[in-house]
Amino acid sequence: MTTRLQAPVAVTPPLPTRRNAELLLLCFAAVITFAALLVVQANQDQGVPWDLTSYGLAFLTLFGSAHLAIRRFAPYTDPLLLPVVALLNGLGLVMIHRLDLVDNEIGEHRHPSANQQMLWTLVGVAAFALVVTFLKDHRQLARYGYICGLAGLVFLAVPALLPAALSEQNGAKIWIRLPGFSIQPAEFSKILLLIFFSAVLVAKRGLFTSAGKHLLGMTLPRPRDLAPLLAAWVISVGVMVFEKDLGASLLLYTSFLVVVYLATQRFSWVVIGLTLFAAGTLVAYFIFEHVRLRVQTWLDPFADPDGTGYQIVQSLFSFATGGIFGTGLGNGQPDTVPAASTDFIIAAFGEELGLVGLTAILMLYTIVIIRGLRTAIATRDSFGKLLAAGLSSTLAIQLFIVVGGVTRLIPLTGLTTPWMSYGGSSLLANYILLAILARISHGARRPLRTRPRNKSPITAAGTEVIERV
């Protein structure tokens, strides 16, 4: 008879996925959103109609579905990403609903913008769930880097080629108008081009790290290696000139510079890139009237407070009215600012929530950005690192451009505030961005699968007992 004693098997407990914490935070975001709606209704002397209750139920159902998609297909995703974005989206809905109440009093439109924004939120969350479900590995995107780059360029170019009646609004040719709705393709271009930049920088890293001459302590790239930077410069200046969209131009170009710097760790690329952009902007200032007008309005908006400077002047008055603590939700007059639900929603929050409330909102964005950068640090592959860092940096740059524009720190650009401003294109694109970031986060936090070693200590080895019969 032979008896074989097996070695004990060590069982490692699975790492916590923290999905229950995410669900709890989502419920907290829903409570804050609904409470803010009640405050608006109370301060506007409104009742609590069924529509308001349906907003809260729909909000909780939508993000509960997104939570289930993450729990099933990406359980190791950072638990803070979705709840923080849900809260930002909810606060945006509250402000849009608050502006609807004013519009209804003066009879400007029949269809509330909050209902349309809720519909776009449904589309955005559905897109988020689809990306989380079907994008099994973020590294698959690197295979389609050149296709994404070509698609991103096409999306940028189409509005410039269309007639003004189909693409121009408020002086910028950035739209594609279709029957029943409009699309702003630049919102999707920023994601597609970031995928392209990340894939190319991983595959062609040597092209960007080749040593050249030294100047002022910096290692300059070789002249023949400047082609990618010059191409990005031409594209960004072309968008600024032909589509009259300074915001998209600045966002795309600075995002490219950030990714290049992260890939090469050479500050010379940033210096050369910013010098080229400044030179292009200076030339455009003297040649093109719309660029010159935008800069002059930024420098002195009170020179024409009822004309070209009206938007920024009203925005500054809103911040001044809000002060430190704000007038309270529903108690201010944010409707006096043009485009308060889109380009100037930050000014609307600044008036009714004050500096304290606006700082809290900016801290929510900071949480998303920092968690995205932490994901980039934790990711094991180079493509994922660059893409996660690029997506997070794009959010940071866009937020800086928006806040800087409405506070007159930089020229007004017309970019929307992610997840808060009214608009389907921005909402849909940013939920896709969040889904990709969530997928990268899942890959970074997921425990590695390791095969057990064949070697075992002598004490755990099998023994044989041979019995004579």
Curated annotation (Swiss-Prot):
One GO term of the biological process aspect: regulation of cell shape
Residues recorded as bearing Phosphothreonine in the entry: 463
Signal peptide: none
Residue spans crossing the bilayer: 20-40, 50-70, 76-96, 115-135, 146-166, 183-203, 226-246, 248-264, 267-287, 312-332, 344-364, 386-406, 418-438
Coiled coil segments of this chain: none
Membrane topology: Multi-pass membrane protein
Catalytic activity line of the entry: [GlcNAc-(1->4)-Mur2Ac(oyl-L-Ala-gamma-D-Glu-L-Lys-D-Ala-D-Ala)](n)-di-trans,octa-cis-undecaprenyl diphosphate + beta-D-GlcNAc-(1->4)-Mur2Ac(oyl-L-Ala-gamma-D-Glu-L-Lys-D-Ala-D-Ala)-di-trans,octa-cis-undecaprenyl diphosphate = [GlcNAc-(1->4)-Mur2Ac(oyl-L-Ala-gamma-D-Glu-L-Lys-D-Ala-D-Ala)](n+1)-di-trans,octa-cis-undecaprenyl diphosphate + di-trans,octa-cis-undecaprenyl diphosphate + H(+)
Disruption phenotype annotation: Deletion of the gene does not impact in vitro growth, but it leads to aberrations in the cell length. Deletion enhances sensitivity to nisin and vancomycin. Also exhibits hypersensitivity to moenomycin. Mutant shows compromised bacterial virulence in the host.
Post-translational modification: Phosphorylated on Thr-463, probably by PknB and PknH.
The protein's role, per its UniProt record: Transglycosylase involved in peptidoglycan cell wall formation. Required for the regulation of cell length. Plays critical roles for the survival of the pathogen inside the host. Required for both bacterial survival and formation of granuloma structures in a guinea pig infection model.
PANTHER family, alphabetized: CELL CYCLE PROTEIN, PEPTIDOGLYCAN GLYCOSYLTRANSFERASE RODA
The protein, known as: Peptidoglycan glycosyltransferase RodA
